């Protein structure tokens, strides 16, 4: 029986490359000359710290970071940015967490979405991924389109497609 897994993963090497590209652009931009502005990736917690001298500049840095990550194949929805910026001394900063795995609430929404579609497939939650099995490849491809089209606030990848 054909099957595949629905996962939500961020390639940390690509994230590091995107952060490095964003740092390079910030260093060369005129509006950031003489300004303390940094973007740092913490591999251990899978967070990105964006720091600058004003909240407006932090927003600009976030826009640059999102654009560079998108060029590296990481969607902006995989960044979980807190709404409030932290003011510490003369700097402002914000922590953005990279979403890894699918939370249980989102998993339940996906399974409900698949079951409500009346396709002849079964969806099983397995840890941080969802295994979908069905008799025909067409049904599985319909499920892929359904999950991509559903507005669930997170990008998904499909792997382990077996025939």
Curated annotation (Swiss-Prot):
It comes from the Bacteria. One of its GO terms (cellular component) is cytosol. Pfam families: DUF520. InterPro entries: DUF520, UPF0234-like_C, UPF0234_N, YajQ-like_sf. Keywords: Nucleotide-binding. PANTHER family: UPF0234 PROTEIN YAJQ. Belongs to the YajQ family. This is Nucleotide-binding protein YajQ. It comes from Salmonella heidelberg (strain SL476).
């Amino acid at each position: 029986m054909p099957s595949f897994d629905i996962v939500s993963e961020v390639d940390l090497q690509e994230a590091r490359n995107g952060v490095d590209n964003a740092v390079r652009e910030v260093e060369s931009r005129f509006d950031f000359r003489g300004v303390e502005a940094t973007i740092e990736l913490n591999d251990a917690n899978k967070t990105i710290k964006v720091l600058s001298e004003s909240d407006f500049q932090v927003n600009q840095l976030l826009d640059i970071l999102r654009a560079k990550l998108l060029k590296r194949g990481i969607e902006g929805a995989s960044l979980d940015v807190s709404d409030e910026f932290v003011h510490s001394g003369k700097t402002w900063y914000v922590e953005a967490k990279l979403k890894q795995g699918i939370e249980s609430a989102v998993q339940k929404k996906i399974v409900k979405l698949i079951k409500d579609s009346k396709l002849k497939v079964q969806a099983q939650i397995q840890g941080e991924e969802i295994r979908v099995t069905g008799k025909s490849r067409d049904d599985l491809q319909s499920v892929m389109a359904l999950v991509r089209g559903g507005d669930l606030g997170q990008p998904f990848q499909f792997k382990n497609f077996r025939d």
